[in-house]
Amino acid sequence: MPTIDFTFCEINPKKGFGGANGNKISLFYNNELYMVKFPPKPSTHKEMSYTNGCFSEYVACHIVNSLGLKVQETLLGTYKNKIVVACKDFTTHQYELVDFLSLKNTMIELEKSGKDTNLNDVLYAIDNQHFIEPKVLKCFFWDMFVADTLLGNFDRHNGNWGFLRASNSKEYQIAPIFDCGSCLYPQADDVVCQKVLSNIDELNARIYNFPQSILKDDNDKKINYYDFLTQTNNKDCLDALLRIYPRIDMNKIHSIIDNTPFMSEIHKEFLHTMLDERKSKIIDVAHTRAIELSLQHKQAHSNPYDNADDLDNSNEYTPTPKRRR
């Protein structure tokens, strides 16, 4: 695969970007505008550095695309002597990005601000917003959650997903999924990759214990992906799992990894292994349970005298948010 050198591309000095992990510049490549993300500068706390953030962004977005979800386009290349990821700017054609945080801030009846990631409050905001038909937005949210579960995304906060607002009509559409640099264990360098591959306890810890979702329960505790997806009765979540599961093509996913330039062989082996493990130990287990619950639901409704419990329309995380006092 030919590699791309962005060094001599025309820079757009009039656009800047937020975010904490690494520098970003705007430039033109093939007459299209891209945001180019650089790897973060070395940290004194190596275990907290995002060593492979550019690889994570590139590979994760291509995997999300393979699932049939709308996602930003990414290219991997170099800028001077650094490996960078270029993310195609989807706001260039008269669209403005409005993040979910901004929307949630308008829910003045909620006790906490738009930044807070309590799942109940997020679902409440989805149900009560007027940007997008709530059922459509809810489907998108749970599809993204299932994808983030497979990819181990620990930072899908309210500021890195949202909407595109047309500047002329003020109409809204759901923005492509973006900012996937916190997927696929970006803090794992080659030494950590080798350590995990040679120790089943280290591997399982990264499946069952962490990374966790940044979404929180009502006890302000981060949601564990395995526990949530294998225990929830949230019909919208289970429907998303049943919808996304048939699209997970591990051969395609492994091909994406194999064809990623610049990546070390041990890093590729690590990603192959971790994605196989996350699928078999989380997604497959949750999917089997989702099928069983779906069958129970159908059987219960086929018999008018059967009082079997129905699947919740929202689950234990029913939108009953804490109100402002």
UniProtKB/Swiss-Prot annotation:
Protein location: Secreted; Host cytoplasm, Host cytosol; Host nucleus
Catalytic activity: L-seryl-[protein] + ATP = O-phospho-L-seryl-[protein] + ADP + H(+); L-threonyl-[protein] + ATP = O-phospho-L-threonyl-[protein] + ADP + H(+)
GO BP annotation list: positive regulation of cytokine production; positive regulation of NF-kappaB transcription factor activity; positive regulation of non-canonical NF-kappaB signal transduction; positive regulation of peptidyl-serine phosphorylation; symbiont-mediated activation of host NF-kappaB cascade
Gene Ontology molecular function terms on file: ATP binding; magnesium ion binding; nucleotide binding; protein serine kinase activity; protein serine/threonine kinase activity
Disulfide bond sites: none
EC number: 2.7.11.1
Keyword Nucleotide-binding in record: yes
Cited Gene3D superfamilies: 1.10.1070.20, 3.30.200.120
Positions annotated to bind ATP: 21-24, 37, 72, 88-90, 179
Induction (UniProt): Is strongly expressed in response to the interaction of H.pylori with the mammalian gastric mucosa.
GO terms for cellular component: extracellular region; host cell cytosol; host cell nucleus
Region (Disordered): 296-325
UniProt keyword annotations, A-Z: ATP-binding, Host cytoplasm, Host nucleus, Kinase, Magnesium, Metal-binding, Nucleotide-binding, Phosphoprotein, Secreted, Serine/threonine-protein kinase, Transferase, Virulence
Pfam families noted in UniProt: HipA_C (PF07804)
Modification after translation, per record: Autophosphorylates on either Thr-3 or Thr-7.
Role according to the record: Virulence factor acting as a pro-inflammatory protein that induces the secretion of the pro-inflammatory cytokines TNF-alpha (tumor necrosis factor-alpha) and IL-8 (interleukin-8) from human macrophages, as well as enhanced translocation of the transcription factor NF-kappa-B complex in macrophages. Is a kinase capable of autophosphorylating itself at a threonine residue near the N-terminus.
Domain notes: The C-terminal tail (residues 301-325) is not required for the kinase activity and for translocation into human cells.
Designated name of the protein: Serine/threonine-protein kinase CtkA
Organism in which the protein naturally occurs: Helicobacter pylori (strain J99 / ATCC 700824) (Campylobacter pylori J99)
Lineage: Bacteria, Pseudomonadati, Campylobacterota, Epsilonproteobacteria, Campylobacterales
